[in-house]
Amino acid sequence: MSKPDVVIVGGGSAGAVLAARLSEDPDRSVLLLEAGPAYPPGGYPPEVANPAMLGPRTGRDWDDMTEPGVIGHPIPAGRGKILGGSSAVNGAVALRALPSDFARWADRGLKGWAFGEVLADYLALENTTGGDDRWHGRRGPLPVRQFTRDDLSPMQQAFMDAAVANGITTTSDLNGPVPAGVAPLPVNIVDGIRINTGMAYLGAAVRRRPNLQIRADVVVDRITFSGSRTTGVILAGGTALEGAEVVLSAGTYGTPAVLLRSGVGPSADLRALGISVVGDLPVGQNLQDHPIYFNTYAARPDRIGAQAPPIAVMATTASSHAAPGDFDIHLGATHLFDPSQSPTGAGFALTVAMVRPTATGTLTLAGRDPNQAPRIDLNLLGTSEDRARLLEGLRLARRIGATSPLADFADSELNPGAGATSDADLEASMLATVSTYHHPASTVPMGSEGDPRAVVNRLGEVRGLEGLRVVDASIFPDVPSMPINLSVLMAAEHIARLAY
């Protein structure tokens, strides 16, 4: 393939979707570049196929770390380095962004992304048998299975009951018209296998297309330009590849790093590194992620019973700070717990995620070497409002943990511990142990022509440049208030449908 029509950088949640959809046209040649390995659709190793293995435990992670920031300590910034990207190493939760997320984007002037305008793309990616036909897809590439109460562990069933006892309603479908309440999760897991986009979208027949070439184990350094026109990419090591159009789908961390090394970003930062400025744009300046806290318990070994599935239930609710239609707190009950940390040899965690952060962080280059990790400052809990929201969620989780039947499974609370009662105690514990929900977004945000934060337009085209597009979670104007993987697939479906 001498000069493909489209070069896609990154074969993850968005890139695999784009490669499959764009190569449906036999007259369009597509080159997909992936930094990690490319396994056959049915040949992913057990540590990747197993949905209980997450992030670094899969052995296919970038192993980046965040800056210490407000919380005072670095945390892993996991992203998948494999064909399938982060969809191959995540929790396989198949949830959509809320209508209120898209309404918020529209309020900022973004057109074409109202919930009613993207619902068709959510349906196009989905293959499920449950739910209402108006809300669910039946023939898409990604299989989605709805856990039922019977699928949950005894502890997770008790969590549902204790949540209801604390005023949280039940819902039958977190992807349906009423996405508030507690329910078992929809997941892209089939027969115990996490189905990533490298399997679902890049099946054997797709990979055999003569107009699609997949190159694995190649790291892209930067994009090349002739004036303002994209001409191709340069790989780490110096190999140049031509392309009529370049699409960056390297993820919220990878995409802005490539742009910055290419001279697209804040001009002062680029000049400080000796990089010639091609486009002075606010790349990397609007990073957001969801903070998550683990309220952990030592379990009674005689009561805990089966400890699988690890992630299978969630409650969505609103703090006192939430806007109408927003659900800014997610609570979960998980068996992702190291039993060596419990005096009883068993335990569980209630997760508390705050999914409408007001704080923004940054992604900047530490240097020009494409193999050097960028500086990732998530600025988790960087505002008093974010800390107040998470604190409300933690207090609710503790009430649920102290309510039967869930309380009957616990021997004692480990984090924050029974002695932590005041707001100051709890905030100190939050800062010391908070982590990321691993939903980073918004480093290359979409926006209207007049939006000073925007780097790309509604179809992912980079402002002021030709032949360069971005399609991944980095283009979200802000982080959606749900796990983002399904929305990344939706965005790729949406732009593939409208732009090509």
PLM features: what roles do these ranges have?
Residues 27-29, 36-41, 223, 232-307, ...:
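Glycine-rich loop(s) and the adjacent beta-strand/alpha-helix scaffold that form part
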Residues 292-395, 434-442, 470-473, 477-479:
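FAD cofactor-binding and catalytic pocket of flavoenzymes
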Residues 106-222, 226-230, 294-298, 306, ...:
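Conserved redox-cofactor binding core of oxidoreductases
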Residues 163, 274-276, 395-401, 492-500:
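Internal hydrophobic alpha-helix adjacent to the cofactor/substrate pocket in enzyme cavities
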Residues 276, 383-409, 428-432:
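Flavin-binding catalytic cores
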Residues 2-123, 272, 276-290, 294-297:
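N-terminal glycine-rich phosphate/pyrophosphate-binding loop and immediately adjacent elements
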Residues 12-17, 150, 252-253, 475, ...:
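Residue-level detector of alpha-helix initiation sites
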Residues 47-50, 63, 182-193, 215-216, ...:
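A glycine-rich dinucleotide-binding beta-alpha-beta segment and adjacent secondary-structure elements
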